[in-house]
Amino acid sequence: MNKTLVILFSINIVTSQPVLEEFYYGDVDRQYYLYIPTTIEPESPLVFVFHGFTSSAENIMEYSGMNEIAETNGFAVCYPQGTTDNNGNTFFNVGYSFHWNQTVDDVGFIIALAEHLQAHYNLSPINTFSTGMSNGGEMSYLLACEFPNYFRAVAPVAGTMMESWYNTCNPEYPTPIFEIHGTNDNVTWWEGDPQDLGGWGPYVGIDDIIQLWRTINLTETVVYDTLLDINLADG
């Protein structure tokens, strides 16, 4: 697919074995992988990486390459594991129509986990970031809407914003956005799906999402960059 990068704000920001950890929140035992570089300074950044629908923390850790980047640049990476819905699919609760009866509080879980990791590993509370693929990208947008004071910037990949919370997204603080999306994405459509033809629930098109964050961030200009599809087999 053709891929377009949208930058609303410029940010600058293997050898250690990732460890599967457990964290109890909301009467549920949650799991996550944590990667700490072999050498890391106090108050280093923390990056959350969220997997997609039906995927796993281990899977996105393996294919994202974030551990190698963290090792080189000196930041911690956390890969939270979603819970399982009634059909046995792993997910983060962002409001899909078929998850209307799911009560898991993923936002609360991530905020509590961030505070735990910041305190336990002496990581920076003001340099916490989020990215994710598809459902994980939507989780990043949701966190930016609801807890912008916790996340310095977010970088959703192939994600969108559900209409149910797009219409109420009015954060107190601006959040830099690095939006990555395929213009021919046949799962999460670039133009959105307000009629819910795809069955996920009504969601917003990428152009509308960018316009929303331009307004929130008081951004006068948006930088678009288009990349060629160099791997036709990657979906």
Where on the chain are the PLM-derived regions?
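Sec-dependent N-terminal signal peptides
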Residues: 2-16
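A domain-start/cap signature at the N-terminus of enzymes
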Residues: 15-46, 58-64, 69-73, 102, ...
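Structural cue for short, hydrophobic secondary-structure segments
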Residues: 49-52, 79, 179-180
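Serine-hydrolase catalytic-loop signature spanning alpha/beta hydrolases and amidase-signature enzymes
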Residues: 54-56
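Cap/lid segment of the alpha/beta-hydrolase catalytic domain
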Residues: 81-105
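Conserved acidic catalytic loop of the alpha/beta-hydrolase fold
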Residues: 108-126
